[in-house]
């Protein structure tokens, strides 16, 4: 099967479907025919750390994956923050500390651990993700074996 490559869309198209793409108004104007070896190399998994781009000559090429933008780093930090909060809440809920505290049954080491975990949650809430990737994440309390 023969393929064409479009630098504009950074995509391959089967040449035998040109009529269908043309009728749909989606056949690229910059289509260049590529041999099977080029198609196989650039339609599969990219080498580690690379992405497919449109080369200067209109053919596909490999390029380094660009570093994440600041906005992407912030989004990743927000996700991590929420995951850490969820993990802490799950752990605390598994111990039923809130219920025990409400009825006065939380004492001693359990009370101390509960307060450490509440402090940890407070510290997580205060994390400013806008400074990503330079974030000092709070350390969770040591988990006490029971």
UniProtKB/Swiss-Prot annotation:
GO-annotated biological processes: response to oxidative stress
Transmembrane feature ranges: none
Intrachain S-S bonds: none
Protein name as annotated: Uncharacterized protein YfdK
Protein family according to the UniProt entry: To E.coli YmfS.
């Amino acid at each position: 099967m023969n393929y064409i490559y479009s630098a504009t869309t950074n995509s391959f198209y089967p040449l035998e479907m040109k009529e269908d793409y043309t009728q749909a108004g989606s056949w690229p104007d910059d289509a260049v025919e590529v041999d099977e070896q080029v198609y196989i190399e650039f339609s599969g998994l990219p080498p580690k750390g690379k992405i497919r781009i449109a080369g200067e000559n209109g053919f596909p090429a490999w390029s380094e994956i660009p570093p994440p933008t600041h906005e992407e780093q912030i989004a990743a930090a927000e996700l991590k923050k929420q995951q850490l909060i969820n993990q802490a809440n799950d752990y605390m809920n598994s111990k039923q500390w809130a219920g025990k505290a409400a009825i006065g049954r939380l004492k001693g080491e359990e009370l101390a651990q509960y307060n450490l975990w509440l402090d940890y949650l407070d510290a997580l809430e205060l994390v400013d993700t806008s400074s990503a990737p330079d974030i000092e994440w709070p350390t969770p309390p040591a988990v006490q074996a029971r």
